[in-house]
Structure formats: C-alpha cells, structure tokens
Amino acid sequence: MNDNPAVNKVFNEISSLYKQYFEYAIKVRKWLEIPDDLSHREIGYGMLKKVDNRNMSFNTDGEYLTWVLKESPFHLYKSLSYMEYPDVVGGAAKKGLFKREVAFDIDTHKTEKCTHDDSWICEECLGEARNQVLILIEDFLFPDFGLSEKDLKIVFTGNRGYHIYLKPENPELLKKIEKWGKNERRYFIEYILGKNLNLRNMGSRWKNILIREFKKNKIATKKFEKTSDWKTEIDTRKDTTRRTIYETIGKVKSRLELDEKVMDDDIRLLRTIGSLHGYTGLMVKEITYSSLKNNQFDPLNHGVFSKFHKIMYKVNIKQEIDPLTLKGDTFDHKSTEIPASYLLFLFGHGIDFEILE
C-alpha cells in the first residue's frame, strides 16, 4: 500500500468496485466466461500492472470462480492454448500445448479525426475499430474461408479493439484449425495483411479488393480484371498513375491494425469475456455480428456496467484531461461529481485525482 492516505482511499474504493462487479457478474448474471476445458487453460491476472501473474490453473469451475470473487482482479486473462501443464513456467514445450484457439486481435490507435490524447478513447477511434472488424469478416473470413456469422465469436475488449475468435460449427473444421501450429497461423494472418502479395500472380480475393479501391480512386481497372500479372500492367502506366496505384495498394494492406503476436504466440493470453478492462473499467463483452454490422452496439454506452453509472462520487481532478462521454454524459477535469464508471476510467489511466468526503 502507499503511504499517502488519499491514494490508499482511491485504491481501496476501486478494489471495492471491482469486487461489486464480479459479485454481480458471477452470482447474478453469470456473465463471466469459464474457459472450456478449464483445467488445461492457463489463467493470468493484473492489478496495478497489465499482467502481475500468470501460470495459474484451476481444476474446477467452482475453484476458479471462488478465486475470482476473492481477488477481483482489474485485468483477467485466459490462455488461447490448451496445455497439459498450464501452471508450469516456460514456453509451449514445457507446458505441453496440445491445441490452441485461433483468434484475431484488432487494436486501433487514435485516428486523424480524434482530438484527444493518444491513450484516450472516443467515438471516432471506436468506430474505426468497428470498421476494421467488418473489413476482416466481410473481405476475408466470409468470402475466402467460407465462414458464417455462426462460426465467429466477436468480443469487445473493453478498450479500442475487438477479439474475433474462429469457432466453426463444423466439428471437423474446428478440430483442424485448433491443431494449427505457429506456421499455419502465421501464413493465415500474413495472407490477410497482404504481406506476401505477389503482383505477378494476383489471387482472386485480393484482386477484387484492390479493384474496388482502384475504382474509388478513378483508376482504370479493365485490364487488371483480365490478368493476374499486375506488375507488367502497372509498369505500362504513367508515373503519376503508377504512384497512385502503389499508394492505394499500400493503404489497403495497412488498413487492418491486427496484433500479429496474438496469432503468432503459442502461449498468448486474451482477456476473459465478462471481466472488466483495467484501463477503462468497461466490460469485455461478447456481441453479435449483426449488432456490429447494424451499428447497434455502442461501446461507450453498452460497454458501461450500468450500476456503476448510478454510483456517484465527489472528486477533485488535479490535471487537465480530455473529455469522455459515457452513456451520453460527458466528463472532464472540471467535473466535480462523477459516476463510478468514470472513476474507473480515471484510475486506469493514472489520472491524478482524489475522492472527497
């Protein structure tokens, strides 16, 4: 604990709020995910750091839930991998990895339209995260891999991103992708990111995506549609057109902010569905593809634990900060009475404030 009573008061209050949340999420709503085959999954958690400890495992659901209720961690994780020895310290070989979930992590940065500090969030950067999920699904996962909405699990991370799990209903396909090794997963994500794009032998999916973008930039596409050797065709164009073509290809290849380590790392941890994100206090929440597609999910509304928006605190915020809107209410450094939902966000971002009597 800190020697400063005001700091201790804030930490104790934050800890109490997390405990209240887990009591409700576990005992009342059954929100908290219990990872499949729990005894073969590694569990990690963080309090003041993103990850304070990992290499934990639990034999039963009850043991796991009892631990969560007792500790009420600010960050809670489970491994994507299934392991024979999840509590052993070391890599995949020591842990005895025998299969692994396949998931994408889209984690966006602030956009050109954002007016806030890099670490803050707003409708613009959250909207960009949504758009990137739809690009991943509609440009690749649906048409290229024959997946449907029922084959995906989409999770809002509680910050500026989403996790997209591949969960095919076909048991044989699910078994196959969960047996993928690092090389197969690496090939998968590099294809989607266009890292190995061969302009002398363009595949149909990337050809269709790029032709669509060329048309937006008023680049003639008829000859590109008829050939797979794009390099030769590009070389016939004028310098300005050629430059525009390469710039367009570059922008398309870089439009997805995918965390490649999540696909590459054999023993990667991801946030547990139904927990809270320790930096924002927002819920790690599973949503449907249709709610995302139809813009029915608003992270700054539906990601807020409603009960925490009704508990109010008198505070003194000691530094200037950007505004943040939660559930339609906007707060900033001038706010003197704030809900617990905003209190968690301030704490997670290391903002200097005190709770008043």
From Swiss-Prot:
Gene Ontology molecular-function annotations: DNA-directed RNA polymerase activity; metal ion binding
Native source organism of the sequence: Methanococcus maripaludis (strain C6 / ATCC BAA-1332)
Coiled coil, from the record: none
Pfam family, one: DNA_primase_S
GO biological-process terms attached to the record: DNA replication, synthesis of primer
NCBIfam families linked: primase_sml
Cofactors, names only: Mg(2+); Mn(2+)
GO CC terms: DNA-directed RNA polymerase complex; primosome complex
Family assignment from sequence similarity: Belongs to the eukaryotic-type primase small subunit family.
Role summary: Catalytic subunit of DNA primase, an RNA polymerase that catalyzes the synthesis of short RNA molecules used as primers for DNA polymerase during DNA replication. The small subunit contains the primase catalytic core and has DNA synthesis activity on its own. Binding to the large subunit stabilizes and modulates the activity, increasing the rate of DNA synthesis while decreasing the length of the DNA fragments, and conferring RNA synthesis capability. The DNA polymerase activity may enable DNA primase to also catalyze primer extension after primer synthesis. May also play a role in DNA repair.
Residue numbers annotated as active site: D105, D107, D259
Keywords for the protein's UniProt record, in alphabetical order: DNA replication, DNA-directed RNA polymerase, Magnesium, Manganese, Metal-binding, Nucleotidyltransferase, Primosome, Transcription, Transferase
NADP listed as a keyword: no
Name recorded for this polypeptide: DNA primase small subunit PriS
Enzyme class, first EC level, given as a word: transferase
E.C. number: 2.7.7.-
Subunit structure: Heterodimer of a small subunit (PriS) and a large subunit (PriL).
